[in-house]
Amino acid sequence: LIAERPGRIRLFREGRLSTYAELPVYHRGESGLLGLALHPRFPEAPYVYAYRTVAEGGLRNQVVRLRHLGERGVLDRVVLDGIPARPHGLHSGGRIAFGPDGMLYVTTGEVYERELAQDLASLGGKILRLTPEGEPAPGNPFLGRRGARPEVYSLGHRNPQGLAWHPKTGELFSSEHGPSGEQG
């Protein structure tokens, strides 16, 4: 599967490229369709997860789930909503991946509002950790903390764009990008 930022998901199979799904997105700057992940038990659990920016009902980022139906995907439900987005479309984060623990990890940017990255009541500037159903994952560090979003796994991020796990230790690595030197 290939994600295209304007909202199209393409299926490349046996040398052929076809449209798998088309999702409505707000596509400006770095926003749009930004990440895809297969359920860790795919195809037994026939779900594809996507991170997108939407404008309908208020501008925001969200994680949605599609049901895999052979050659196409059909929007099944919203897994997580209310991730900050701004009209400029910058610093939306948007990488999603299932970790070795079977949980869904979601990167979110601080949308050029640096204070969001340290605000535990905001989903912006974080790495989130969810169950495949979209609930806060057991063992998240801020579960039960008053005023904190229980989905938060890591905070203080500018615009994380990559996720990977060490193959032996399972340690999570996240990559971010930006200009060199002092960020002041």
Which residue stretches match the model-derived regions?
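Blade/loop signatures of beta-propeller domains
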Residues: 13, 69-73, 133-145
